[in-house]
């Protein structure tokens, strides 16, 4: 990824966090955190990695809400970031936080057993 793509990625991460927490009023949208954004070098596509707190059903509902609000989110990004073309976004669940929590839990169990 080039320097410009990195800057756009960081700016999108910041703006997406704000949009998801303040602008979207969908009740299906649970506790969502934007953990990262990968933008292609030509700034045409962006993978948005999100962490969702809740059950699998709540995660599924949150993804549905994000897909429904996709156009609104894209237009908001276009208003906030000066780009010739707003990248096409896809949302993916980032399981690294859950994985880290599971490792912490296993380590605590191991320490309690000793």
Swiss-Prot record:
User: One of this protein's GO BP terms?
Assistant: maturation of SSU-rRNA
UniProt-listed Pfam families: RBFA
Q: Which GO terms describe its molecular function?
A: ribosomal small subunit binding
Which cysteines form disulfides?
none
* Entry's transmembrane regions: none
Coiled coil (residue ranges) = none
Q: Enumerate the Gene3D superfamilies for this protein.
A: 3.30.300.20
Q: Where is the signal peptide?
A: none
GO cellular component terms attached to this protein's record: cytosol
Compartmental location: Cytoplasm
Q: Which InterPro entries match?
A: KH_dom-like_a/b (IPR015946), RbfA (IPR000238), RbfA_dom_sf (IPR023799), Ribosome-bd_factorA_CS (IPR020053)
Q: Which UniProt keywords apply?
A: Cytoplasm, Ribosome biogenesis
Per UniProt, subunit arrangement is: Monomer. Binds 30S ribosomal subunits, but not 50S ribosomal subunits or 70S ribosomes.
Q: Which family does it belong to?
A: Belongs to the RbfA family.
Q: State its role.
A: One of several proteins that assist in the late maturation steps of the functional core of the 30S ribosomal subunit. Associates with free 30S ribosomal subunits (but not with 30S subunits that are part of 70S ribosomes or polysomes). Required for efficient processing of 16S rRNA. May interact with the 5'-terminal helix region of 16S rRNA.
Name-wise, this protein is Ribosome-binding factor A
Native species: Listeria innocua serovar 6a (strain ATCC BAA-680 / CLIP 11262)
- The protein's gene is named rbfA
